[in-house]
Amino acid sequence: MELRSRRSAEAYLVTPEEPAKNKSERSIESNERVGTREAKSENTSVFSPAYSDTATTDSSKKVDDNEYYNFTSHFMPSLKNTRELENTILNLIQRIKEGDDETLVSEKDLILSVLNRSLASTSHWKLQAQLSELRATSEGRYAVETNLLKKEVEFLKNKTPKTNESASSAELRPLLERPLKRKLSLPGLAQRPLSTGARLEGGYGGVSPNSWKTKVPKLPLPASRPSLNLSPQKVPTGTDKVEEDTKIDTLELVENNKPHPRMRRRSDNPATNEYVRVFHLEKKEPKSRKK
């Protein structure tokens, strides 16, 4: 389980790939990949930082190699290239151990290319380690911020729960009691008779036909509104009424046909013009009595 968790964590580390391999490296890897795995001695132990933190023996390494190769072949190519580079280095070490001094000269180009790829792979995974550290710090900071927010919300919720509940209950009690009091204060209306025959017989259920009218509450009469006249009103007497009648008889309403500043003339037809009609009171001319 630890091996799979470590590989799944490494699968997220992705950066530009390492340089391409030479033809000689490809031929060596294709021909000697299987042979070198079986030709290793039982006493030697191999340290593989790509997938293990401790040295492993050949008995347990065969299973891990097959599992890890199948895993990396379907995932990120950077892991696959790193694993292939590891196999190439192991093959090259084995060939140098078994060979003579001439092998160093013959395999000079291969050694240089492997060293170059090793440097690229080292820089690649060093960058990935730095990125993982930064990601871990950012995730830890985010977790701390979320925990602080949760604690703050819980503190605000549990700050004064008792006082809030008592105040809310005290406010709700009168609101719940008011409609009940109103219902009890209203007079109960008797049921109306179902037919005219029941009315003639004395009412339905022993109730007189006009008893429900007496129990209906009467609405208050609308209050009389004061007049809009600003002048103080006087109680009219008999002499005042006679004087007002004489004044009304001596005055008449006459329309003023002079042009007015508020008049609007839109056409020659006076019926369509929108204007303000001005009237004034004039004294009536005394009619000449016929002799």
UniProtKB/Swiss-Prot annotation:
It comes from Saccharomyces cerevisiae (strain ATCC 204508 / S288c). Coiled coil: none annotated. The modification Phosphoserine is found at residue 267. GO terms for cellular component: cytoplasm; nucleus. This is Uncharacterized protein YDL129W. Residues 1-62, 220-242, 255-291 are annotated as: Disordered. Residues 18-41 have a biased composition (Basic and acidic residues). Disulfide bonds: none annotated.
